A protein has these predicted regions:
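Conserved alpha/beta enzyme-core scaffold
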Residues: 1-177
Length: 177
């Protein structure tokens, strides 16, 4: 695994650049930080129109993107209830391949009856995974499980900060099989 140092804004900007097939996109965040020093792919430049200092963020093109959505047919026509987040669309458009786990696989006739609900057309693979987003929410199916997130946070904190991995190991053994 290669580490590519950045912050969230740079990550999304790089994905957007790849989704739009651009050589880079400008980003204001990170100007004046050490990010361009620790990540040589980030180039500081002067905006030729306004003269402002910006960072050129190159396209980030994942080999594979893994997403979660409400439903899809067997042909990869994905439907997010309430629409996808913009990051899902950037990831889908930037990646070479997209795998989407869904709460339900629906008949193609249902997709064709509601074509405006299709947010991603032609995902490379669909995996039926009821409760696949748990402990987070899946719109239209279940809400975020804050009690479960608290269990995980306590276990991870004990392992990371207190040097006690037993609680995290027990959590992973019980919930992540």
């Amino acid at each position: 695994i290669e580490v590519w140092e950045c912050e969230e804004g740079i990550l999304t900007t790089g994905l957007q650049a790849a989704a739009q097939a651009l050589p880079f996109l400008p980003w204001r965040g990170g100007v004046g930080t050490s990010l361009p020093e620790v990540n040589p792919d980030l180039k500081v430049f002067q905006d030729p129109i306004c003269g402002e200092t910006l960072i050129a963020v190159p396209p980030l093109k994942p080999d594979v993107t893994l997403l979660h959505a409400a439903t899809s047919d067997a042909y990869g026509n994905v439907q997010h209830l309430g629409g996808p987040g913009w990051l899902d669309l950037f990831l889908y458009r930037a990646a070479d391949r997209t795998i989407v786990q869904v709460e339900r696989v629906i008949p193609n006739e249902e997709v064709r009856a509601n074509p405006w609900a299709t947010t991603i057309g032609g995902a490379d693979a669909i995996v039926r995974a009821p409760y696949g987003a748990h402990p987070f929410y899946s719109r239209g199916f279940y809400v975020q499980d804050n009690d479960h997130l608290r269990l995980y946070t306590e276990a991870a904190t004990a392992a990371a900060q207190d040097g006690r991995p037993e609680q995290l190991h027990a959590y992973l053994t019980q919930y992540c099989r």
